[in-house]
Structure formats: structure tokens, C-alpha cells
């Protein structure tokens, strides 16, 4: 069985590399880690994955991105992969966006950046979400 995907989306390449590094360090043995630099690029990736009948376990999206913000992206992502766990990342105490996301996107979690150390602030959250996803996951 093919490994499911984790997708992370952030327009800041340095931040994106850091997220990818943290994800690979912990999850590469069980998941395929993908990254995208915009909501538009990420939606193309999600569509390709769906067309191949592969699964996305988790989507991490930055809130503040040009063209399409994190909430707008996650709304569209949910249409393509409704079962994926959705996490909104923000560097700001952007409670308005968080409330909108929780209501509109059925957001699973809201994470503040930076989350160093990831062992304390990132992995426990993602472990719980991935456990939930696996509990509901029914491979075709």
C-alpha cells in the first residue's frame, strides 16, 4: 500500500524548508512529505493525488499568503480531500482567521509559528491528528 501524503503550504521558502525538515525528521518513514509555495500550486498537487487515488492524511497551510490565504485554500482543499486533517499555521495572534477557519473549514488545529522545539509544540499535535485520521481511514 502506498504511503499517504502530508502536504505543507507556505509562501515563505525558508519557513517551508523548516516545516519540511521537521516533518521529514519525524514522519518520512510512514508518510510522503510534499510542499508547495502557494495555495494554487498546492491545489494542483491535491488534484493530482486525488486523480491517482492516493491519500492526503494531513494538510498544513500558512494563513498569510498572497492571492489565496490559508482559510481560502483549506476550503478548496477540503472539497478535494474531505477526510484530510487540516491545520492552519500563523505567526500572528490572528484569532479572526482562526475562528473563520474553524467554522468554514472544520479546522482540526491552529498552530502558532514558530513551534520550536517541535518535539514539544508540533509533533504531539500532529501525532494526535494522524492517529485520528488513521482511525477513520478506509483504504480503497
Language model features with spans:
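Two-component/phosphorelay signaling modules centered on CheY-like receiver
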Residues: 13-37
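Receiver (REC) domain active-site loop signature in two-component systems and cognate sites
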Residues: 65
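Active-site residues of response regulator receiver
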Residues: 10, 61-62, 90
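Short amphipathic alpha-helix used as the core "switch/output" element in two-component signaling
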Residues: 44-48, 71-85, 100
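CheY-like receiver
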Residues: 119-140
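Active-site beta3 strand of CheY-like receiver
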Residues: 7, 50-60
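Alpha4 helix (beta4-alpha4-beta5 surface) of REC/receiver domains from two-component response regulators
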Residues: 68, 72, 79, 92-112, ...
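Helix N-cap/capping motif at the beta->alpha junctions
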Residues: 20, 35-48, 70
Amino acid at each position: 500500500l502506498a504511503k499517504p501524503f502530508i502536504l505543507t503550504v507556505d509562501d515563505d521558502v525558508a519557513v517551508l524548508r523548516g516545516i519540511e525538515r521537521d516533518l521529514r525528521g519525524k514522519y518520512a518513514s510512514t508518510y510522503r512529505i510534499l510542499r508547495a509555495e502557494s495555495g494554487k500550486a498546492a491545489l494542483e498537487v491535491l488534484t493530482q493525488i486525488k486523480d491517482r487515488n492516493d491519500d492526503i492524511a494531513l494538510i498544513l497551510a500558512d494563513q498569510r499568503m498572497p492571492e489565496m490565504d490559508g482559510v481560502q485554500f483549506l476550503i478548496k482543499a477540503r472539497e478535494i480531500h474531505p477526510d484530510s486533517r487540516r491545520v492552519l499555521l500563523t505567526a500572528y495572534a490572528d484569532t479572526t482567521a482562526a475562528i473563520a477557519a474553524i467554522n468554514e473549514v472544520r479546522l482540526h488545529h491552529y498552530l502558532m509559528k514558530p513551534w520550536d522545539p517541535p518535539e514539544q509544540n508540533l509533533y504531539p499535535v500532529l501525532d494526535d491528528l494522524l492517529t485520528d485520521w488513521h482511525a477513520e481511514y478506509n483504504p480503497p
